[in-house]
Structure formats: structure tokens, C-alpha cells
Amino acid sequence: MSIVMQLQDVAESTRLGPLSGEVRAGEILHLVGPNGAGKSTLLARMAGMTSGKGSIQFAGQPLEAWSATKLALHRAYLSQQQTPPFATPVWHYLTLHQHDKTRTELLNDVAGALALDDKLGRSTNQLSGGEWQRVRLAAVVLQITPQANPAGQLLLLDEPMNSLDVAQQSALDKILSALCQQGLAIVMSSHDLNHTLRHAHRAWLLKGGKMLASGRREEVLTPPNLAQAYGMNFRRLDIEGHRMLISTI
């Protein structure tokens, strides 16, 4: 798989790094680790929202060389939960994120996949937390999906499963898997280790802004690595063909 993004000695004051790594096309990479590990700081840096020490190459060019307009065409970024920036119908908010605004059928498909069909006419400031999270997810998917944006390469998601129930999480997993199969690189932070063990191709395990381990999910999410990151013991079980992590007292 081709390299979409290359990080070299990336650091930000005392919150992050230095750390190095690469993001590959057609893969789902999970950032895992305890609160304060640096996951959100790293995602914001990868999105081009902040600057600091070290270098990031995106699609073969320095990240800082990309204009905001061009960057928005090639990568999409979902920050942690935020309130609606203004009151507008959901359908209009989603349309604002589409590069091809004539693709109404795609908007309806993505909205339907995230169970937003009956929310399209509602104002964004009248949504519950979970509904607003799904609207935000639909927006970044519409922005970057190769179906309507051939230039789309990278999707960055900061705790996308927040406020989603089990069915909604499953629906999002299906969407992300389809985007991955179309060649998109996906990087997301997660607090659910078993979700990472099942759905990620690779993982970066962070603690205190440092990279403790990186590689294939089963190589990173080992009981010794997790004990070092979280300060507690873990066991890895095989249940009906599925690997599962549990903490032990």
C-alpha cells in the first residue's frame, strides 16, 4: 500500500512526541491510549490545524505547503464533539460539505446509512448529542468519499464513536470499511480496545505523548504493552473465533 502521510519526529511542547510513523492508503489506523496520551493533539497536527517541531509529508508534499482549500479537497477531519456553529437545516449543513453539490442521491444514501433520513429537515440546533455526532460524521464522509471526490485521500476522526449506540457504531464501521476498500486512508482515535482489535488494520499505542508501540493490531494490543500504557493488567481471550481483551484485578 502506498504511503499517504509520513511523520518524522513530530512534537508539540510537552504534549506530544517526538514520534514518527506512516499512514497508508486503504488502511484503518487506530490511535489508542489513556486520556492525555496525545491522540487528539496528534490528529489535529496531522490535519494541519496546528504546527510544531518535526515534519509531516502529505501526498509527497510538506503539510504546511498545502492551502486550506486544497487540503479540504484531499483530507477531512472530525474534531471532538462540538456544538453546531449555526442553525441551519441538516440537509443544508451536509450540502455545504459536498464538493459536488448536485449529488443529492449520495447525500441521501449517507444520511440513510446513519439513520438520519427523518432528520434532514430539522435544524442543527434542535438535535440531540448523538444525532449531531451522526450529522458531523455524515458531513466528513460526504466531503472525502471517492464516490464524489476523486481527490479524497485521508479521513481523520477524533473519537467518532462518541454518543453512538451499538447499531450506529456498526453502521459507521460499514461506511469506514467501504471507504477503506476504495483506497482511502482512515486514522481514528478510540477508547474501545476490543473495537480496535476487531476493526483496525494497524494501531499506534500512545502514552504521555510518546509512541509505546506501533504495528499490526494484534502485535500492538498485547497484555504487556497495555499494562505499560494503562497501569493495569490485561488478558487476551479467544471466544468463538474472536479475540477479546479483558482487564484483570
Curated annotation (Swiss-Prot):
EC class: translocase
GO cellular component terms listed in the entry, alphabetical order: ATP-binding cassette (ABC) transporter complex; BtuCD complex; cobalamin transport complex; extrinsic component of membrane; membrane
Catalytic activity: an R-cob(III)alamin(out) + ATP + H2O = an R-cob(III)alamin(in) + ADP + phosphate + H(+)
Subcellular location: Cell inner membrane
InterPro entries noted in UniProt: AAA+_ATPase, ABC_transporter-like_ATP-bd, ABC_transporter-like_CS, ABC_transptr_BtuD, Metal_Ion_Import_ABC, P-loop_NTPase
UniProt cross-references to SMART domains, sorted A to Z: AAA
Residues binding ATP: G33, P34, N35, G36, A37, G38, K39, S40
Keywords: ATP-binding, Cell inner membrane, Cell membrane, Membrane, Nucleotide-binding, Translocase, Transport
Keyword Translocase assigned: yes
Positions of the ABC transporter domain: 1-233
HAMAP family in the cross-refs: BtuD (MF_01005)
The name this protein goes by in its record: Vitamin B12 import ATP-binding protein BtuD
Organism: Escherichia coli (strain K12)
